[in-house]
Amino acid sequence: MPIILHPPEERIEAVLLVGQMLNVIVDYSYVHNHGGAGAGDAHNNHIQITASNPIQLLVRAGVFDPTYDVAVTGLWIHNPTEIDNTIVRLRMFAIQDEHHPDPLPCSNGWLDMLQRQIKKHETLIIVPGAQVQVLTVSS
C-alpha cells in the first residue's frame, strides 16, 4: 500500500487494510514541550515511544477497546506487550483541516470518524504535529 509523506506542517495519509502492520515512531518531546492532554502527567500504565523505541500497530476492524488508547500526538499505549492482540484506537488531541484551520481539542466526533475510517478500510489520517514518522506498512 502506498504511503504519502507530507512536510511536517501537513498531514501524513496512509491507506491501510485491516490486518496490516503500521510501524511508526514518535518524538514525544513535542507533546511534552507544547502541552496536550496527558502531557506532564504521571501515567504508570503507559510507555513512551521514541525513535529508539518504535512500535508496530496492527490495524483491525471491529469495536474499539478503550483499554488500548493510542494518542497520535504522544502515542501512549496501554499494556504494550499486548498491542498485537488488540484493536488500536486513535485519539487526536489537536487537529487541523479545511473546516477547522486552528487546532481544536479532539471531540468524540473525530474519534468516531477515525474509527469508521479504519473499519471501512479507508484512509487513516495521522497529524504529524508530534513528529510522527511512518516507517513501513506491510501486509
Question: For each predicted feature, which ranges?
Answer:
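Surface-exposed, low-hydrophobicity beta-strand/loop segments enriched in small/polar/acidic residues
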Residues: 1-139
